[in-house]
Amino acid sequence: GLTREIPVKMLGDTRILYVTNCPAFESVAQFEESLIALLVKINEKDHYTYKHSGSVLKYALCLYDAMESQMEHVSRNDMAVAALFHDVGKCFIPVEILQKPEALEPSETRYIFRHPIDSGRMLRAEFGDAVAETAMNHHERLDGSGYPKGLMAEDIGLPARIIAVADAFDAMTTYRGYNKVKSFEEAAEELVGLCDLFDCQVAETLLQLVNNGTIKKEEKEETEPDEQTR
């Protein structure tokens, strides 16, 4: 069976968490010059996004494990790939837009709205439609207010809902240069209260995992704040 432990692999001086014995991740290793290399480029452009990818992977797999009975049509490998590479499309966003502290101009927001599409496009060729759609839909919201397609609840699969919660949770609990950092408990409770946007069951599961210590802040965190990013 697949290990439940998520070991740490060093890529340069940045930690990327991944499941070493999953076939999907052995496949990723074979394409180090493409997807892994793009993550390295993202690290050079925007360190927050790189670290964020590893955190979203960790949280998404914890949620997957807790909700495994509902994930019969979704493999843990596919969830892991979609979570790790959900933001890989950001490699096409100019750094001045990623790190801009003030409101973006309409001509600039198109880059932000585009990145899930680029992530899906880059993943589809190597990992198939299911992984691509999951990554592409992580900014969709249940009430149709998300992007890039403005999908409604019935059109957003559970894997994408899980990554959406994991993505928002990490953004709320990590300093990005312009935000107030929330505690893990505060962030999880707030997400439970946003059930018009995020899946209630996923958010409630996250809160349970925070309360029981399955998801907790690492003892050794970097103390220097990251540059602001989208």
Spell out what each predicted region is:
Residues 18-41:
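Sensory coupling linkers of modular signal transduction proteins
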Residues 2-26:
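Ligand-binding loop in jelly-roll beta-barrel domains
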